[in-house]
Amino acid sequence: MVSLSQDRMKQIEKRFEIIESQMAQNPNAETYVKLASEYAELQQIVTPIRTLNALYKEVTELEAMANTTQIDADMYALAQEELVLLRQKIEQLEQEIQILLLPKDIADEKSAIIEIRAGTGGSEAALFAGDLFRMYERYANAHKWKVEVVSLSDSEVGGYKEIIATISGKGVFSKLKFESGVHRVQRVPETETSGRIHTSAATVAVLPEAEEIDIEIRPEDIRIDTMRASGAGGQHVNTTDSAVRITHIPTGIMVVQAEKSQHQNRARALQILRSRLFDIERQKAESERSASRKTQVGSGDRSERIRTYNFPQGRVTDHRINLTLYKLDRIMEGDLDELINPLISNHQTALLTEINDNA
């Protein structure tokens, strides 16, 4: 493990004290909001740093006492036991602080756009896409995040050929960003009379919800077409002339929205386009910073098979970290923390390893 830089910890404490002093000088409202935001972020690191420094001091004092000639054997043994416990606390706290000091994903605190599309498997894939959406919706509700469907294309037998939704709340993307990829399901369809297990799939894409300040879309870089909604399914097909298609000319990315309000369609299509462009820039920056981490929790490639849901066995397997849980019912009800938290931990471990290798 990389040893913590005492100089860096002192710099963080010094910056925290400066911010604290500036906040006490009654700045204007705009400045105060900026200072308060930085103060809250630094406080999460400064508090454990100060606890760690207190533990360092305690160890130094205890070691000095244990090394005196005046201490008896029993007191020496007690001191050694206490030192073991203190060093364990220090090791744990140092690791927590290292994680807090890891490079931040600029999108982690953002809301997210989730896109779920039925893949191979026909109607069963569409039903599974619906199951996945309800799973994420329940997970969001448990965290008191707001879920809003942006567009959907129904399947004739239930479920969705495609559904796009925003999930709004602080830190949504940090929790859901490792959900992108191919999700495979193995189960017996209700229409299967012989009891044969079918394999189907759905793709999930999770994007950070970008704001206008995050990425600039120049008017000359987009082409906006209005048209009659028609074609591949959906409850609003052939009911409106308000469908909007926005094409980003430099990248060729195309977004179509076909709800009833043309104004709303344009705004939502721009929102999705902005988020896709922002995600491209974010992933490009991440790739340039380091390619070594991509093997740890997967590349985020939408075509990568990341997870299998086996209904007959009640089993879920995440292939990126070789994690298998026999809690399928709970997971489909939105109890995802036992899947999501290990993925986050694995990512953090990979970052620490990378820093260690480059030290």
Curated annotation (Swiss-Prot):
It is found in: Cytoplasm. The keyword Electron transport does not apply. The keyword Cytoplasm applies. Transmembrane segments: none annotated. SMART domains: PCRF. Methylated by PrmC. Methylation increases the termination efficiency of RF1. Residues 283-305 are annotated as: Disordered. Keywords: Cytoplasm, Methylation, Protein biosynthesis. GO terms for cellular component: cytoplasm. The modification N5-methylglutamine is found at Q235. One of its GO terms (molecular function) is translation release factor activity, codon specific. Belongs to the prokaryotic/mitochondrial release factor family. Peptide chain release factor 1 directs the termination of translation in response to the peptide chain termination codons UAG and UAA. This is Peptide chain release factor 1. It comes from Bartonella bacilliformis (strain ATCC 35685 / KC583 / Herrer 020/F12,63).
